[in-house]
C-alpha cells in the first residue's frame, strides 16, 4: 500500500510499501478494542518499533475500533507489560508509552527478613578467578541464564538478542560466570550444573532464594546485602568500596564496580520489600 511518511521537518513523502514483513504474537478483541501483543523472553533496553507499528497500522486502517499495541516481556516468573500508542498513526516516530505493569501467576512469600536469614546462613567462598562484575542489570543476568538454559548462545548471539555491543555481552556472561551460574563451552555460553538447578526451580520464591544464595557466596555482595536488607536501603558507595578492600582494585575502579553491587542489592530489595507484581 502507498503510505505517507514524514520526512524532514513537516514535509511528507509518499512511500510505496510492498509485502512488508509483519507478524503478531497475539491478538485479543473486545467490542471496543483490538489489542495486538508483541511478546519476548529477553530483557532488552530497546526494541524495533516496526514490530508494533506495522501490525498496528494495518489494523488501524481497516477497523473503526481502537487498536492497542502492547509489548510483553516474560522473565523470572514476571510478566512485564507495556502499553503504547502512536499519537500520529502515519508516523512511527510518534510512539509513546501510555502505561506499564508487572504481573505474576503466584504471590511471593519471600520477605526481607527471610532474605536476610538466607544471606547470613551462607558462608562466603573464595573470590573466583573471574573479573569482578560490571553489569548493572541483575534482571538481565538472570534473563541471560534463562536463555542459555534453553539453548547455548555464542557471544554474537547474546549481542544480537540484547542489542548489546560485544563488550556488554562479555560483561553479562562473565557476571553469571562470576556467580558460578554460567560457563564458556567452546564458542558458546551454557549454565553450569548449579546454574541450571537454580534457574529451573519451578517456584519463583525458590528461584529467587537460590539467586540470593549465589550472591551471598561472594564476600562483597554478602556484606552489601546484609547491610541493605537490615536497613531496608541499599548500602552506600563508601560502604561497598570498603567491602572491596583486598580485591586489588584502584579507588576509581572500586567506585565503578560499586554501582553494579548497589544495583544488584537494589534488585534483592525490590524482590522482597516492594514492587510486588499484581496477581493475575
Give residue ranges: language-model regions.
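Single conserved hydrophobic/aromatic residue that forms the stacking wall/gate
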Residues: 2-12
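Short glycine-rich loop/turn motifs
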Residues: 21-26
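Active-site beta-strand-loop-beta-strand hairpin of nuclease catalytic cores
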Residues: 27-36
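Short, positively charged
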Residues: 30, 82, 90, 98-104
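Nucleic-acid nuclease catalytic cores
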Residues: 35, 40-48, 59-89
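Short, hydrophobic/π-rich interface segment
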Residues: 37-63, 237-256
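Donor-sugar nucleotide-binding helix/loop cap in glycosyltransferases
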Residues: 94-280
Amino acid at each position: 500500500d502507498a503510505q505517507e511518511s514524514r520526512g524532514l521537518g513537516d514535509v511528507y513523502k509518499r512511500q510505496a510499501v510492498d509485502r512488508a514483513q509483519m507478524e503478531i504474537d497475539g491478538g485479543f478483541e473486545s467490542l471496543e478494542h483490538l489489542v495486538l501483543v508483541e511478546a519476548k523472553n529477553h530483557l532488552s533496553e530497546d526494541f524495533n518499533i516496526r514490530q508494533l507499528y506495522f501490525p498496528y497500522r494495518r489494523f488501524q486502517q481497516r477497523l473503526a475500533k481502537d487498536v492497542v499495541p502492547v509489548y510483553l516481556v516474560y522473565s523470572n516468573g514476571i510478566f512485564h507489560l507495556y502499553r503504547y500508542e502512536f499519537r500520529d498513526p502515519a508516523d512511527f516516530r510518534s510512539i509513546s508509552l501510555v502505561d506499564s505493569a508487572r504481573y505474576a501467576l503466584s504471590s511471593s512469600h519471600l520477605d526481607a527478613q527471610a532474605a536476610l536469614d538466607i544471606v547470613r546462613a551462607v558462608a562466603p567462598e573464595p573470590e573466583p578467578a573471574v573479573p569482578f562484575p560490571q553489569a548493572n542489570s541483575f534482571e538481565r543476568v538472570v534473563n541471560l541464564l534463562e536463555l542459555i538454559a534453553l539453548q547455548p548462545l555464542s557471544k554474537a548471539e547474546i549481542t544480537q538478542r540484547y542489542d548489546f555491543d560485544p563488550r556488554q555481552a562479555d560483561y553479562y556472561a562473565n557476571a553469571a560466570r562470576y556467580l558460578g551460574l554460567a560457563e564458556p563451552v567452546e564458542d558458546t555460553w551454557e549454565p553450569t550444573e548449579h546454574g541450571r538447578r537454580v534457574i529451573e526451580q519451578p517456584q519463583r520464591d525458590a528461584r529467587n532464594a537460590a539467586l540470593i544464595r549465589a550472591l551471598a557466596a561472594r564476600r562483597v555482595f554478602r556484606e552489601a546485602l546484609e547491610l541493605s536488607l537490615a536497613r531496608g536501603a541499599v548500602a552506600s558507595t563508601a560502604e561497598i568500596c570498603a567491602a572491596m578492600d583486598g580485591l586489588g582494585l584502584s579507588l576509581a575502579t572500586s567506585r565503578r564496580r560499586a554501582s553494579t553491587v548497589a544495583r544488584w542489592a537494589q534488585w534483592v530489595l525490590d524482590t522482597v520489600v516492594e514492587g510486588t507484581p499484581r496477581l493475575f
